[in-house]
């Protein structure tokens, strides 16, 4: 399903100014939950759905309109090829990998039908701090999770060791100077989706001003 652009953007944005409480959206946000990649299965999104998901994902805060991020979509047999190469790298680090860990390394990119790499291209800028650019890439990752959910798929945001090992970057299509913000795994699941503990507001919120 492609995302259509409004014929009259000005009229569309006028509607945003008049937004009302969206109970369905609130209900979704109240239970939004990642699903472990190893619990994912087919089907995953097809190319048209992926493009729709990406169209939604780029609608994030982006100071200076720099778009300091890009995407790499991993699909099909290439995922298994990447897994075999990652296994070789892991065995170079640790020749005594257990059978269980060999399977883990080999299936890093085949647990989910689709994996989307979010690459941070943050760079020094005369006006925009690099930290803000990096946070924009993080916002893209969260938007990807939710856009995938909106299309009926489960999702998870992972990094894992190869996100920080530049020896793996050529294999993954990551250029010199770039960093991995995350690998978003997308698919279906046959497992029950269960809640996990969340922080109590009093532990993470402070207030300044206001009487109510």
Predicted regions and their residues:
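Short, charged/polar surface micro-motifs in flexible loops or helix N-caps
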Residues: 77-81, 88, 122-124, 166, ...
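A glycine-rich helix N-cap at a beta->alpha junction
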Residues: 172-196
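Short coil/turn connectors at secondary-structure junctions
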Residues: 111-114, 153, 176-180
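Conserved hydrophobic/aromatic beta-strand scaffold that supports enzyme active sites
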Residues: 28, 115-117, 183-185, 206
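Solvent-exposed alpha-helices and their adjacent loops that cap or buttress functional pockets
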Residues: 63-66, 108-110, 172-177, 197-198
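N-terminal amphipathic, basic helical "cap/leader" segment at the start of enzyme domains
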Residues: 2-111, 212
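Small-aliphatic-rich amphipathic alpha-helix that forms the alpha element of a beta-alpha
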Residues: 57, 116, 122-170
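Phosphate/diphosphate-binding glycine-rich loops and adjacent basic-rich segments that engage nucleotide
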Residues: 195-212
């Amino acid at each position: 399903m492609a995302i259509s652009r409004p014929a009259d953007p000005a009229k569309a944005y006028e509607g945003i100014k008049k937004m009302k409480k969206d109970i369905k959206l609130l209900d979704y946000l109240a239970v939004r939950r990642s699903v472990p990649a190893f619990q994912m299965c087919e089907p995953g999104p097809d190319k048209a759905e992926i493009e729709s998901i990406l169209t939604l994902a780029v609608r994030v805060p982006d100071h200076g309109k720099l778009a300091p991020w890009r995407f790499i979509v991993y699909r099909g047999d290439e995922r298994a090829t990447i897994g075999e190469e990652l296994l070789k790298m892991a065995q170079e680090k640790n020749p005594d990998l257990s059978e269980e860990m060999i399977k883990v390394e080999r299936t890093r990119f085949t647990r989910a039908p689709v994996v989307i790499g979010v690459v941070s291209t943050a760079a020094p800028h005369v006006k925009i701090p690099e930290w803000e650019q990096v946070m924009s890439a993080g916002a893209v990752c969260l938007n990807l999770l939710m856009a995938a959910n909106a299309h009926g798929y489960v999702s998870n945001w992972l990094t894992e060791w190869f996100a920080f090992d530049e020896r793996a970057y050529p294999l993954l299509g990551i250029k010199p100077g770039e960093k991995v913000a995350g690998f978003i795994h997308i698919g279906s699941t046959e497992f029950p989706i269960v809640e996990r503990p969340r922080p109590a507001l009093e532990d993470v919120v402070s207030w300044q001003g206001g009487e109510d």
